[in-house]
């Protein structure tokens, strides 16, 4: 059984919904075990025990959220050189753009020598005021379907040995 680790951080619920959608779809794929972890609790042992990854983060001030960055910081050197070539997918929950956060996360996982199996999935909530940015989010059904597709694709690819 191949293990898919989904690591996320969410302050307003948007990224959590995305990660849960990916996890639910991935869990439906035979031959794959899904481990959904919040960034604050995930660590190097989780990363080493997985065969593939989905990283899901909100974009805060044009960067990945602090707690997601903390996860990468805590895990980077303990797993460096030990997970080369493993597949990953990336999901960003953004207010308007998301490209800088995606670029930042991609640079980090490039250092780990991970292999992207899809373009980063950026979901824009269009939250532009302080009130809207801090408010609980509800991710649109069509965007959640994209998250499900990413999770299912990674799980199926791992189970079949395609990645």
Where are the regions a protein language model picked out?
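Hydrophobic residues within alpha-helices
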Residues: 18-26, 105, 150, 154
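Helix-loop-strand module that forms the ligand-binding subsite of alpha/beta enzymes
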Residues: 40-124
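A structural signal for isolated positions on well-ordered beta-strands in alpha/beta enzyme cores
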Residues: 4-5, 33-35, 89
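Glycine-rich phosphate/pyrophosphate-binding loop and the adjoining helix
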Residues: 43, 117-163
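N-terminal beta1-alpha1 ligand-phosphate binding loop
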Residues: 2-27
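Generic structural signal for well-ordered alpha-helical scaffold segments
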Residues: 23, 72, 76-77, 155, ...
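Short helix-loop-beta junction
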Residues: 19-32, 110-115
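A short beta-strand-loop structural module common to alpha/beta enzyme folds
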Residues: 31-43
